[in-house]
Amino acid sequence: KLSHCKNMGSSFLKDAALAIVVLADPLASDVWIEDAAIASILIQLQAEDLGLGSCWIQVRERFTEEGIPSGEFVHEALDIPLQLQVLSIVAVGHKGMERKPFNEEHLQWEKVHLHKYGAE
């Protein structure tokens, strides 16, 4: 059911071995979005360390094909308490393909600034 939580970018959940819904309580922390984002990326780093693949599915501020807020859809699907907010779902499983790292020659180093913005 979670594979329908967004109008695009969540259909692969139907084949995922594992889906981790990342939640936070906005009443407990004013930086809940940042905290949940850190938790999401740490899940992805741990999956990679285990030789697994992962994909972040953004839920906050997204909508289903029917226009229902994705967070509301996930709340109803999993009976999540109302005070908790859904930031993301991290799908984990065996990698469908191995991506090559970016070639350093093609990195946009002009977007990296040291000491001050615009300083060379």
Question: Which residues make up each language-model segment?
Answer:
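Acidic, surface-exposed loops and disordered segments
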Residues: 1-120
